[in-house]
Amino acid sequence: ALAGNLCRCTGYRPIVEAIKKIDGDIHLPECSKWSKCMNSKSETASFFYPVSVEEAYELSYKNDNTFYLSGGTDLNLSEISPSIKPNYILLNRIPSLNKIHEKNNEIHIGASVTLEDTLPYFEKFFPPFAEIIRRFGSSQIRSQATIAGNLCTASPIGDTAPSLMALGASVEIFS
C-alpha cells in the first residue's frame, strides 16, 4: 500500500508509464540473496553488496570514489560531479548491521536498521522520539531510511540528530 502525499498533477501516471516501458519478463541471475554476484556496474556507477564489514572495508580500499549506502533515500539529493563515477557500497546485506538490540539499558542500532524497525524500542524507552520518527516522511521512507544515513548526510534539516544529542547518544564509526 502507498502512504503519504501523491502529486495531484501527475498522480500515478509516471509510475504506470515506467512499468509499461518494461518489455517482457525480468530475469535476475540465479544466485543466493547474499551472493557476490549481486554486484552491478553501469556506465555511470557501480554498486557493491558486501556480506560482511570486512568485505565492505576491502571494497572501499580497492575502489576510488566510494560512498556507503544503506537505505539510500537521499541518494538523488546528493550532487556528485558528472566526471566522477561513484562506487556505492550497499551495507544493507551485512547481517551484523541489520541488528537492533537492548543491552545494559542502552539501545544498539546497526547502520542498516530502518527507522520503522527502531519504533518498538523508542516507544519503550523514549516515546517522544518515537513520535518524531512516526512523523518522519511517509511509511515507505521510514521502511527504507536509516538513522545512520540521516546522520551521515549531515543535512541541516536532519530530523534525528537533535534528539539523539539530547538523549546522549554515541556513534561508533568504522572507516
Report the location of each language-model feature:
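C-terminal structural segment of proteins
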Residues: 1-175
